[in-house]
Amino acid sequence: MHTQRRSALRHFVHDHSLTLVSALILGTWVILYLQADPQTHFGAFYGNAIADWSGTVLIVIATKWLFEKGSTESRRMPRHFKNRVREFLISHSLTLFVVATGIGWIVLYSALNPMDKWGEVVGNIVSEWTQVLGMILFTKVLIERGSKESRA
């Protein structure tokens, strides 16, 4: 029994190692930032790293579970839908998720002083979310010659 649990844990860690390591790195930056003075180089770095690694965790998790019709970066979608609304929601779940959570970050940012310690970090997260949304939309229509992910 003990060996089965260890094997299951090992498979879980292996199968989700990118998510786990990315989240661990993000958590490390948050812990370091909690103790840091944002007016120092290290403090400013930790705050920026939180926003950057939040975007990484978003990309890793969202692209694992969600879809974006027309994006070469997205997972393949299920083929058959009987309900048009459900089809739309699933087909664009990646964009809808990033927009919905982005609105949440914007609401939080608007309630914070942008010059305060966490106001600056949340502002950077809003910027990161905007960049991710832009890339999702860009990959639907734009190409980059020589990129294996691109259509051309």
What are the functions of these language-model segments?
Residues M1-H14, E68-S71, E144-S147:
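N-terminal soluble segments of membrane proteins
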Residues H2, R6, Q39-T40, N83, ...:
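Short, structured coil/loop segments at alpha-helix boundaries
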Residues R5-A23, R84-V98:
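Alpha-helical transmembrane segments and their helix-start/interface "positive-inside/aromatic belt" motifs
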Residues V21-I31, L96-L108:
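Hydrophobic core of alpha-helical transmembrane segments in multi-pass integral membrane proteins
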Residues Y33-W65, T72, V107-E144, K148:
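A structural feature that tracks compact, well-ordered secondary-structure segments
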Residues E68-F81:
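Membrane-helix interface/capping segments
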